Amino acid sequence: MPQTYLCFLWHMHQPFYKDLISGEYKLPWTRMHALKDYYGMVRILEEFPKIHQTFNLVPSMMAQVAEYASGAAVDPYLQAALEPAENLSEETRRFVLRHSFYSDPQHMIYRYPRYGELFDAWKAQKPAGGRVMFSAQDFRDLQMWSQLAWFDEEFQQTDPDVAEWVRRGRNFTLADQRRMGEKQREIAGQVQPEYQKLAASGQIEISTTPFYHPILPLVCDSQIAGVSHPNVPLPPRFRYPQDARRQLAMSREYIANVFGAPPAGLWPSEGSVSDEVFSIASDLGFSWAATDSGVLNRTVGHGVPVEGLYRPYQWRQGKGSLGVIFRDHFLSDLIGFVYSKMDAAAAADDFLHRIRDNCSGILASGRDALVPIILDGENAWEYYHRNGRPFLRELYGRISNEPRMTAVTVSEGLKLLAPEPLDHIFPGSWINANFDVWIGAEEDNQAWTQLLRARETFDSATAVTGDKRNLAFEELLIAEGSDWCWWYGPEHDSENRPEFDQLYRSHLANVYRFLNLAPPEELSRPILRVALPATMIEPTGPITPVIDGEVTSYFEWLGAGVYRADERAGSMHGKKFLVKEVQFGSDDVNFYLRLDFHAAYQQELAGMEARITAGPRENGETSYLAIGFTHGGATIKEARMAVASENMPPPGPAECMLSRVLEVRVSLPAMGVRRGQGIRFQCSLWQGGLPMDAVPQQGWLEMRTTDPARMEE
């Protein structure tokens, strides 16, 4: 009987945060994800022995975890969390406050009452330049919770110390702090053995990525970016295929030393591939590689149906040969970006329903289907309820009980289906089948130019030999990593962008220092330009726009509040930003809302649904509108008003119209909102029962409605 074979590949990666000269870890995220994800993601599979999966381990991440496990890692963030609260200097207090709330508020801060209480107190006391008045006990509790919130569900439920800290919640002691530091080292020490255990049993396969996570096609030849994006502005040519080979060879050696055998498989950093990369990988002994369905589409020159996607391929050129699978971009991104907003069971049901539907025709024809699900194995879970563990248990349990569905490793899957031949692979990544995230923008190109200068300096500094030369070359390999240019350019944002910029320039400066040369002055200046975050402008007066879906006149929305979303993603990429701008305001009797959409998505709106929730800011029930979009406009599909409004004269409590923009009117009395009262609201866009965008991404937008009496004053 034909089967559906699911190939899950979880990519585990963090940038190389260690400065090789100072020995310090400049950011704590490898340690934090070791607590929250690296162990728990593989440990959960022991509950589901039928589920076989592939884990893609980046050696530079594993090396950092090993340093934390040995106690050799020097981490100022951990040191600050362990310092006695009574002894904190003013500088350390500011450091603790700045870095203790880098967590998702909904799922990682407010989940724990004391952490949420401290977060609210920090926000309330944080006017520009103001000093936050926390007691020593407040600081100690914050030091503990900034770490505890990152402990995996496994430890929160089964480890006696961690479970007791979570239960107690407050009034932690210095002994608790010290034990918490020891516990982190213990957990880091459990990561590698857990992978070794399940790899030895055959339940998981270990694949890898080039050692410091470079975009291999660009390291081989940066000019190849012009193939996938003609006319993209490019920096001076960087062409060092020998570095690409070295990064891959180091990875194979590292994995072989840890797991007793070299890896068969390769997830090139960010799914970035080219014929030259495949040739090098094949020559080094890799037998398979994975990339994205977008790359397959551009390779064959057209959109590939699921019959073509759900099968393996065999790439051959000259003496080179590699098995290749292409990730289902849509299904993988559902886990990465959409299901976090849904009930765990409903999300698992939706996922498997889509797979059954996609595979029905393939199975009916008598063929097996191989479905590659490939995504980040760490960053998505902080946006899920309880770190995504309820969702994974629902999903794995259902797959285990499906008679025509089997979860396999990639190598297992490649043995089960005959491959389709490929004589060429289009150069691209999993993001839009090009390399635009890492090259082409002004910041990116400046980073590549500085990398090239350092690389050329290394080649010419032949007088330096031995350990210093080796360390200089290692710094070059680190600087070739993809993570630095991930944060340059317009695509992504993080509060840590300045630290990433500083760390990249430090790695390049260290190249010169190890070569006994003074770093060029340009490395002392930030590459980053000024960021443009989300902006919010309060309403300045009453408005009464015509609800026609058109910008009838500049003046009809004059006085409205404006919210412009920050359109950069964080550490995850794949979020669609459909809404460009929100305008809002009121008159004596109505609340008005206008959504302006990005032109690139205007044609995709038909079939979507806008959901608007609004109500009094202080207390009271919220009202809800569901608005369906069609090619001809928009209609209200559902309206739940806080106050009964059946007897309101036409056009009733609410109306809407979609053309160039979406315009919405909602009666203030029907919402239970008095004139002059504060109102809060949020909007989301849905398609096929899945959330696609939300404004704002967290929390509510707020405004005060028009008060005629106040205006007369």
Regions inferred by a protein language model and the residue ranges of each:
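Long amphipathic alpha-helical scaffold segments
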Residues: V166, N171-F172, Q177-G189, E194, ...
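CE4/NodB-like, metal-dependent polysaccharide N-deacetylase domain
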Residues: P230-P268, R356-I374
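Extended, H/D-rich, highly charged conserved domains that either
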Residues: Q125-K197, L218-V219, V232, P268-P312
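Beta-strand-rich interaction surfaces with strong enrichment in secreted/lumenal proteins
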Residues: K580-Q583, P649-E655
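Active-site and substrate-binding clefts of carbohydrate-active enzymes
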Residues: P2-E164, G301-G541
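Acidic/polar low-complexity flexible segments
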Residues: V530-P542, R611-K637, S659, P669-E713
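Short, solvent-exposed turn/loop segments enriched in Gly/Ser/Thr/Pro and often Arg
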Residues: N56-M61, P210-H213, G265-S274, V410-L414
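Short, well-ordered beta-strand segments enriched in hydrophobic/aromatic residues
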Residues: T209, G549, N590-H598, L662-S667
